[in-house]
Amino acid sequence: PAESAEPAEKAPVVDPLAEFRRQMSALPGQWYVLHTYSGYERRVATDIMARAENFEVEDYIFDATVPMETVIEIKNGNKKKEVSRVRIPGYVFVRMDLDDPETSDKVWRTIKDTPAVTGFVGDRYNPVPLTFEEAVAQLGPTPEEIAAKEAAAAEATAPESGSGTQIATGGQ
């Protein structure tokens, strides 16, 4: 006798961009963009966080990030290799609080004096923060990343051939 298979409960579909927006809106500080030497982006991000701790401004500098993307490179004619690379070469995004007049100069100088940083995007002496929408557009998942995650999730939930599902037929 065949047992009826109960339909598996589907996890609620979560829009990755909406989830990212929700997470971003809960974070303190504003996002600023730094110019850096190309090729030094990851090192600058790491150095900024170390300097924030060393100069005791970690309560004002919350995050330094370099948007990355995964691409497939084809080498030697047919060898495919997944490579992670900087999405926007020469730029680092820093989430910080420059609203306190007593500490803003120290925070600004900590960032500006980091090796390989050439300056802030915007006014030379008064950094201009990104709007929320600009920050989401630059730091959020790209449509390609969303599609890849959805494809991977669909592939993970699809039953494999020969996965033990049996079909009972009436006969004999």
Over which residues does each language-model region extend?
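Acidic-enriched and Gly/Ser
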Residues: K10-G170
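Acidic/Ser-Thr/Pro-Gly-rich, low-complexity N-terminal segments
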Residues: P1-A11
